[in-house]
UniProtKB/Swiss-Prot annotation:
One of its GO terms (cellular component) is plasma membrane. It comes from the Eukaryota. It is found in: Cell membrane; Secreted, Extracellular space, Apoplast. Disruption phenotype: Slightly increased growth and fresh weight. Mostly expressed in leaves, and, to a lower extent, in roots, stems, siliques, seeds and flowers. One of its GO terms (molecular function) is receptor serine/threonine kinase binding. This is Secreted transmembrane peptide 6.
Amino acid sequence: MGMKSPNIAAFMLPLLLILFTLSSQLKVVESTGRKLAWGFSGTPIVYTPPSRSCGTSPAVFTSKWRRPRPCRLPPGSYIPASDQSP
C-alpha cells in the first residue's frame, strides 16, 4: 500500500509540468474584427466576421486573417434607407 503514493507522484508531476507548459503557450485574442486566436504561434484559427457583414458564416476556420469583404446583397434585393418610409 505504501508504494502507491510514489508511483502516483511520479506520474502526476510530469503530467502537471506538461499541462502548465501547454497552457502558458495558448492565447485567446479578441479584437475589433472579432479575430479569435487560439494557437501556439498566435496565428488565428477561427475568424468571426463583424456583425455588420451580411450573408457570411459566423465562424471561418483559417490560418491567416483576412480583411472583411464588403456587404454584397443578392440581385433583386433592396433595403430601404432608414429615413424613407416603405
